[in-house]
A protein has these predicted regions:
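Patatin-like phospholipase
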Residues: 2-96, 104-340
């Protein structure tokens, strides 16, 4: 495989009904405890050697669809941590951008890790910042975020991911065709460029080359891969969105720069130019499917104010706890949906 990403190297149980602030705090703290910080005087953080959360848990006959949204993925992180705490693991997960990164931790059975990383490194310019873009050509620092953190600072359990019974696909966009690229990731380490591509935002990221394909963020071509999920033949689909009801995407104000930057990829430019039409139409379809009872949607209950490169840890934690709360609130209905 030729992969080149153009970069340098109940308490154990969340609330089942309307949660209180105290319950949510306990649930969030419990999730974070899945990763252990170093002892004082220790040289490196070491991940606690715990069994993956999916160990000995039967999979639910359902698919999980995860929208992206950069730091808005904190909402998704909260939802998935609640699922893991309740031992809900789906047979198939498909994620875009931040949704793919959160999905990777879900597949590895690592509750707490997605939010831990975002909050812990939010103020570190090496993680996600315009300073990183100026220095490396990537706002989302590839060497730091995809190597130093998972390999040294807060180790990712690659073996747990490899052993996971959950099928996982990451979505990126092929620049030459303008179409979505759905890649089944079986080995997180060896196929990491597909995760990097999925979360490489246009203009502020270098193009990723993987198996001869030129790739960038999957949100441009398939922001919410519900159709992909349906094509698997599954009857149940849980969709986690990162925008509240009523959200409407506006035309891209940076299209002039996009056309200049990606002049060699006309199909990709077309996709960028008309993305707001496709996105808004997709959201309307999702709402119709939800009303018809064919899918189950979890989304923020109010407009999200967290920015794509948010550094305010209080806002990030609030959005994470909102995800926990919304998943807890909808849990009885979700159980009914899955049992029907």
């Amino acid at each position: 495989m030729n992969l080149n990403y153009n970069g340098t190297r109940e308490e154990k149980g969340c609330p089942m009904s309307e949660p209180t602030e105290e319950q949510l705090s306990k649930c969030a703290a419990n999730a974070a405890d899945e990763n252990r910080e170093p002892d004082e005087g220790g040289s490196e953080p070491v991940r606690a050697h715990k069994a993956p959360a999916w160990e000995d848990v039967p999979l639910a006959h359902a698919n999980l669809v995860l929208e992206g949204g950069a730091m808005r993925g904190q909402f998704t992180a909260g939802v998935l941590d609640f699922f893991m705490d309740q031992k809900l693991f789906c047979e198939y997960v498909v994620g875009v951008s931040a949704g793919a990164l959160c999905g990777g931790n879900y597949v590895a059975g690592a509750p707490g890790r997605s939010s831990l990383i975002n909050v812990k490194y939010a103020a570190d310019n090496r993680y996600l910042s315009m300073q990183s873009f100026v220095r490396t050509g990537n706002a989302y620092g590839r060497e730091f975020a995809f190597h130093e953190i998972p390999d040294v600072l807060d180790p990712f359990d690659y073996e747990a991911f490899r052993r996971s019974p959950i099928r996982f696909e990451a979505v990126s966009t092929n620049l030459e065709t303008g179409e979505a690229d759905y890649h089944e990731v079986r080995d997180y380490h060896d196929e990491l460029p597909y995760l990097i591509a999925s979360s490489s935002m246009p203009l502020v990221s270098q193009i990723v080359e993987a198996d001869g394909k030129l790739l960038l963020d999957g949100g441009t071509s398939d922001s919410v891969p519900l159709l992909r999920s349906m094509l698997t033949g599954a009857k149940k689909h849980i969709v986690v969105l990162t925008q509240a009801a009523g959200y409407e995407k506006k035309p891209n104000k940076l299209m002039a720069l996009m056309r200049q930057r990606y002049a060699d990829y006309p199909y990709y430019i077309d996709r960028l130019q008309y993305r707001h039409y496709e996105y808004n139409r997709l959201y309307r379809w999702i709402e119709r499917e939800q009303v018809a009872g064919r899918i189950f949607v979890i989304r923020p209950p109010e407009p999200v104010t967290v920015s794509s490169m948010e550094h305010d840890t209080e806002k990030l934690l609030a959005l994470y706890e909102q995800g926990l709360a919304e998943a807890a609130r909808l849990w009885p209905k979700l159980q009914e949906y899955l049992a029907d």
